[in-house]
UniProtKB/Swiss-Prot annotation:
PANTHER family: HEPATOCYTE GROWTH FACTOR-REGULATED TYROSINE KINASE SUBSTRATE
Organism: Mus musculus (Mouse)
Listed name of the protein: Hepatocyte growth factor-regulated tyrosine kinase substrate
Ranges annotated as biased composition (Polar residues): 307-316, 658-690
Tissue expression remark: Ubiquitous expression in adult and fetal tissues with higher expression in testis.
Alphabetized UniProt keyword annotations: Acetylation, Cytoplasm, Endosome, Membrane, Metal-binding, Phosphoprotein, Protein transport, Transport, Ubl conjugation, Zinc, Zinc-finger
Domain VHS residue range list: 15-143
Subunit comment: Component of the ESCRT-0 complex composed of STAM or STAM2 and HGS. Part of a complex at least composed of HSG, STAM2 (or probably STAM) and EPS15. Interacts with STAM. Interacts with STAM2. Interacts with EPS15; the interaction is direct, calcium-dependent and inhibited by SNAP25. Identified in a complex with STAM and LITAF. Found in a complex with STAM and E3 ligase ITCH and DTX3L. Interacts with E3 ligase DTX3L; the interaction brings together STAM and HSG, promotes their recruitment to early endosomes and decreases STAM and HGS ubiquitination by ITCH.
Residue positions binding Zn(2+) 1: 166, 169, 190, 193
Annotated ranges, domain UIM: 258-277
Job description of the protein: Involved in intracellular signal transduction mediated by cytokines and growth factors. When associated with STAM, it suppresses DNA signaling upon stimulation by IL-2 and GM-CSF. Could be a direct effector of PI3-kinase in vesicular pathway via early endosomes and may regulate trafficking to early and late endosomes by recruiting clathrin. May concentrate ubiquitinated receptors within clathrin-coated regions. Involved in down-regulation of receptor tyrosine kinase via multivesicular body (MVBs) when complexed with STAM (ESCRT-0 complex).
Zinc finger (FYVE-type): 160-220
């Protein structure tokens, strides 16, 4: 909506009223003017007209179509964009289908045909041409078309141009200097270059809008040309014989010149009398009220009705004193002295050329000088304070209307005075006997000091405002300098901030570099510590290796024990069954090097004093034990009635089964079958995952080899027990777990172990000991 939406709605309702008998062209033209001058937006106007077109009343629809036709023809491109589109064309087609009124249908067809012809060269309005062709194909009969109906001559206001400087004076826009657009040309101007207001009839703008100086001159030039043609003389005067007469004034003879001189003398006489009266009045006023203001104009000027009155009695005494006064005014030295005194007086006076037009009565050339010089001496007696009175009154709230009234009264008095004198001159009357001329002269003479005061006030005001302009210019320069200083200060602050930021970045970079160096040093120290720890660990490992080597050398130098496993004994259970120890057993006063296995020759080297052998087998005297040979124990055989444990109670399936047999007697060993049960030394072996080959019951040679380092290293358990190559299997060897039957209590059996049957050698008979070897 626009600012004139209410007016537009009212005019649209009036133009489309169902009570109309004919088209209301006045309202339609006003609607067009509202749209053209921008008071109503084109989109809003077209939508409102569409609503009227779709009204059920055919009269309203017909008048709305008339309004739409006029708007399209007169309002330019903005309305064309709203009407010549697909939506509007579809709405008109739908209205044509459902409308039964013939006049409305014909009007719709007429408009579509006219718009299609008018917009035939506009590509963006091609939808109108397409709609027209489609409707022709559909069989609609269009009315007779005249090309004059499609003539659109609508000028619209140009689009506004945006810029940062004035189009005329090139002043940059800012906070104080604002942008203004000319409604006639669309350019952008400052306030000084676009201070004029004018109507633009060619754009339909009937109200005064802002225009630039060139457009204002162009528009007003046309208006003045039209006005001059209208203010010419009427044709009746031109055809009359009066116009054929010469308009030049008649030549004056000596008599006329003499009368004019007498008139000037009479004016001077009346002026002197008026000055004298004014002087006396001011003296009485100043003595009573020293600071009183001068009397207003109404008291000094006679009423308008008395200007043309001719009181004979008042003019008679003035005529009697003509001769002495006339002699005084003819004295040139007197007036020259008055002029010199007026020049020396401090009171400013009006310039002579300004007073000449008011006092000049006619075409005389000599008398105006004396008339202009007459009021000058009288200004000497006037004080300076009254001169500033009107100006102070004006500053205290006196409006300009009083000055306008004063000037109008003075102008009327002067014009009346001049006309009266001309009339007297034309009739040949003497002006000295005309009381109206004298009264007018007196009133004009009274107004003259006030006119001088007004001129002084205007001069003072001009000086005052010039001073203000100078101060404004100084303020403007100061603001410019201040703005420059502020900009320079901001630039300095920005540079300082940038420098501080750069220094901060440099410091941060230095700190980061120092921290990186410290980190590298810390990592280097950590690496050195780690290397040192590794070296210490390596030294400890070397020391342990040296200790192991020394231990091995000491073992190699020491004699071998006859029974290396003498301290490893297993206590028999109550049933007399011997169990193999399930794990290594620690004994006091022993030394076990790292990596040694319990049961090896290295294990238990530094044992305390060996306990005496409790077994029934004495050690071999005077011989050196072979490290590859392990002392054999003779296990007593069990009772004859003892049987092997059932297979259900067997241990791991990989272990050899128990087999009860009679060991064959071996030379050099005694049978202990008849001895009482006693604790036998248990044989501690390292855990093995494979079957261990035991020595069979065949006789073996008991020759011992010397105890050397090579045999000791071969006897160490450092090799993997799971390798079968290191566990040689001796053919004919019979593994033997002896079942022992104690003398007291029922016979018990050892846990049976799965054992393959012997492959070589017949089983031995009798209760004999068996030699068992452990590698």
């Amino acid at each position: 909506m626009g600012r004139g939406s209410g007016t537009f709605e009212r005019l649209l309702d009036k133009a489309t009223s169902q009570l109309l008998l004919e088209t209301d062209w006045e309202s339609i033209l006003q609607i067009c003017d509202l749209i053209r001058q921008g008071d109503t937006q084109a989109k809003y106007a077209v939508n409102s007209i569409k609503k009227k077109v779709n009204d059920k009343n055919p009269h309203v629809a017909l008048y709305a179509l008339e309004v739409m036709e006029s708007v399209v023809k007169n309002c330019g491109q903005t309305v064309h964009d709203e009407v010549a589109n697909k939506q509007t064309m579809e709405e008109l087609k739908e209205l044509l289908k459902r409308q039964v009124e013939v006049n409305v249908r014909n009007k719709i067809l007429y408009l579509i045909q006219a718009w299609a012809h008018a917009f035939r060269n506009e590509p963006k309005y091609k939808v109108v041409q397409d709609t027209y062709q489609i409707m022709k194909v559909e069989g609609h009969v269009f009315p007779e078309f005249k090309e004059s109906d499609a003539m659109f001559a609508a000028e619209r206001a140009p689009d506004w141009v945006d810029a940062e400087e004035c189009h005329r004076c090139r002043v940059q826009f800012g906070v104080v200097t604002r942008k203004h657009h000319c409604r006639a040309c669309g350019q952008i101007f400052c306030g000084k270059c676009s201070s004029k207001y004018s109507t633009i009839p060619k754009f339909g703008i009937e109200k005064e809008v802002r225009v630039c100086e060139p457009c204002y001159e162009q528009l007003n030039k046309k208006a003045e040309g039209k006005a001059s043609s209208t203010t010419e003389l009427p044709p009746e005067y031109l055809t009359s014989p009066l116009s054929q007469q010469s308009q030049l004034p008649p030549k004056r003879d000596e008599t006329a010149l003499q009368e004019e001189e007498e008139l000037q003398l009479a004016l001077a006489l009346s002026q002197s009398e008026a000055e004298e009266k004014e002087r006396m009045r001011q003296k009485t006023t100043y003595t009573a009220h020293p600071k009183a203001e001068p009397t207003p104009l109404a008291s000094s000027a006679p009423p308008a009705g008395s200007l043309y009155s001719s009181p004979v009695n008042s003019s008679a005494p003035l005529a009697e004193d003509i001769d002495p006064e006339l002699a005084r005014y003819l004295n040139r030295n007197y007036w020259e002295k008055k002029q010199e005194e007026a020049r020396k007086s401090p009171t400013p006076s009006a310039p002579v050329p300004l007073t000449e037009p008011a006092a000049q009565p006619g075409e005389g050339h000599t008398a105006p000088n004396s008339m202009a010089e007459a009021p000058l001496p009288e200004t000497d007696s006037q004080p300076i304070t009254p001169c500033s009175g009107p100006f102070s009154e004006y500053q205290n709230g006196e409006s300009e209307e009083s000055h306008e009234q004063f000037l109008k009264a003075l102008q009327n008095a002067v014009s009346t005075f001049v006309n009266r004198m001309k009339s007297n001159h034309m009739r040949g009357r003497s002006i000295t006997n005309d009381s109206a001329v004298l009264s007018l002269f007196q009133s004009i003479n009274t107004m003259h000091p006030q006119l001088l005061e007004l001129l002084n006030q205007l001069d003072e005001r001009r000086l005052y405002y010039e001073g203000l302009q100078d101060k404004l210019a100084q303020i403007r320069d100061a603001r410019g300098a201040l703005s420059a200083l502020r900009e320079e200060h901001r630039e300095k602050l920005r540079r300082a901030a940038e420098e501080a930021e750069r220094q901060r970045q440099i410091q941060l970079a230095q700190k980061l570099e120092i921290m990186r160096q410290k980190k590298q040093e810390y990592l280097e120290v950590q690496r050195q510590l780690a290397i040192q720890r590794l070296q210490e660990q390596e030294k400890e490992r070397q020391m342990r290796l040296e200790q192991q080597k020394q231990t091995v050398q000491m073992r190699a130098q020491m004699p071998a024990f006859p029974l290396p496993y003498a301290q490893l004994q297993a206590m028999p259970t109550a049933g007399g069954v011997l169990y193999q120890p399930s794990g290594p057993t620690s004994f006091p006063a022993t030394f076990s090097p790292a990596g040694s296995v319990e049961g090896s020759p290295m294990h238990g080297v530094y044992m305390s004093q060996p306990a005496p052998a409790t077994g029934p087998y004495p050690s071999m005297p005077g011989t050196t034990a072979d490290p590859s040979m392990v002392s054999a124990y003779m296990y007593p055989t069990g009772a004859p009635g003892a049987q092997a444990a059932p297979q259900a109670q067997a241990g791991p399936t990989t272990s050899p089964a128990y087999s009860s047999y009679q060991p064959t007697p071996t030379p050099g060993y005694q049978s202990v079958a008849s001895q009482a049960p006693q604790s036998l030394p248990a044989i501690s072996q390292p855990p093995q995952t494979s079957n261990i080959g035991y020595m069979g019951s065949q006789p073996m040679s008991m020759g011992y080899q010397p105890y050397n380092m090579q045999n000791l290293m071969t006897a160490l358990p450092g090799q993997d027990a799971s390798l079968p190559a290191q566990q040689p299997y001796i053919p004919g060897q019979q593994p033997l777990y002896q079942q022992m039957a104690p003398s007291t209590g029922p016979p018990q059996q050892q846990p049976p172990v799965a054992q393959p049957a012997p492959t070589q050698g017949p089983p031995a008979q009798g209760s004999e000991a068996q030699l068992i070897s452990f590698d």
